[in-house]
Swiss-Prot record:
GO molecular function: anthranilate phosphoribosyltransferase activity; magnesium ion binding
Protein source organism: Sulfurihydrogenibium sp. (strain YO3AOP1)
Pathway assigned to this chain's UniProt record: Amino-acid biosynthesis; L-tryptophan biosynthesis; L-tryptophan from chorismate: step 2/5
Cofactor: Mg(2+)
Assembly behavior: Homodimer.
Protein name: Anthranilate phosphoribosyltransferase
EC number: 2.4.2.18
Keyword Glycosyltransferase: yes
One Pfam match: Glycos_transf_3
Length: 336
């Protein structure tokens, strides 16, 4: 059957649910050769992955993941993006997670070490003194007790080990770059998902809705950011239960001054750690804090802690300058 699937992909035909299920079951179980893995990943990429293909693959990844049980999901949000924007910004979605938790939300943060940037979410968490190699039970306790838990992707998606080598050897983005944010082990009902290409916003919004997410924002900054941009307009896909809307926003809509890209760029792990500490300790009054507040606001709005993005920015800044986000960081450092 795998040869038939490869043939179909070379003819740029979409796979059926049954074919995609067969393919990903065998892919994740390590039953395909390196050549077959390379062929199907490039075949899907060249054809363009359909909503059904992405949704089916995401369901299989979630089924095979180590589950994190969170009893109260009423304000549980995931802020994981695809990464890969190559603009070298600091870790805004990770810093936003501390802010959202400090403001009263619960964040199931899902991430990995750097692949395309100098500093991934796992790298910055470690640099900040937070233990990332935790069991599912420990992450569940972090979320319940502190409001933020970090799930280090390799530990919660062990079957991914069967494709790591091939993905590195291929060296281009594949379906796996978008599956991470769609396969949160805590199964959060709310999500803010940044994507590296505008063309992904609409299909991934539909995928999230099909996967049962209650409310979500899928965002792409038109400057290339996989975040809500402070330097340009942002294309947004919004899920509100059964409704989907697509629209564009800009920083000025929320009373923020537009920044230049160099103002929000980071560097290596040490540099990004210092930026994170400066913001969370309430010492930064630059566009970097505006950038964090803007992205935090979308998460605060999606879980219903505020009624508008502008109110979310105000709450995020209040949380930052009252050092409530930094308190979350200290609790995670001391977690045992």
């Amino acid at each position: 059957m795998i040869k038939d699937i490869i043939k179909k992909l070379t003819e740029r035909q979409d796979l059926t649910k049954e074919e995609m299920t067969y393919l990903f079951d065998n892919l994740m179980e390590g039953n395909l050769t390196d050549a077959q893995i390379g062929a199907v990943l490039i075949g899907l990429k060249m054809k363009g992955e359909s909503v059904l293909e992405i949704e089916t693959a995401a369901r299989i990844m979630k089924e095979k993941a180590v589950k994190v049980v969170v009893k109260d999901k009423s304000k549980l949000v995931d802020t994981c993006g695809t990464g890969g924007d190559r603009l070298n910004t600091f870790n805004v979605s990770t810093i936003s997670a501390f802010v959202v938790a400090g403001a009263g939300g619960k964040v199931a943060k899902h991430g990995n070490r750097s692949i395309s940037s100098k500093c991934g979410s796992a790298d910055i968490m470690e640099a900040l003194g937070i233990k990332i190699e935790l069991t599912a039970e420990e992450v569940s306790r972090q979320i319940e007790e502190i409001g933020l838990g970090f799930m280090f992707a390799p530990l919660f998606h062990p079957s991914m080990k069967n494709v790591i080598k091939q993905r590195r050897e291929i060296g281009v983005r594949t379906i796996f770059n978008i599956l991470g944010p769609l396969s949160n082990p805590a199964d959060a009902n709310y999500q803010v998902m940044g994507v590296y290409d505008k063309s992904l916003v609409e299909p991934l919004t539909k995928v999230l809705q099909n996967l049962g997410v209650k409310k979500a924002y899928v965002v792409h900054g038109l400057d290339g950011l996989d975040e809500v941009s402070i330097t340009a307009e942002t294309y947004v896909g919004e899920i509100n239960e059964s409704d989907i809307n697509f629209y564009t926003v800009k920083p000025e809509d929320f009373g923020l001054k537009r920044a230049e890209i160099f103002e929000i760029q980071g560097g290596d792990v040490e540099c990004n750690k210092e930026i994170a500490l400066s913001i969370l300790q309430g010492k930064d009054y630059s566009s970097k804090t505006d950038f964090v507040a803007l992205n935090s606001a979308f998460a605060l709005k999606v879980i219903g802690l505020v009624d508008s993005i502008k109110d979310g920015i105000d709450l995020a800044k209040e949380t930052i300058y009252n050092k409530k986000g930094y308190e979350v960081l200290e609790k995670l450092r001391n977690f045992s």
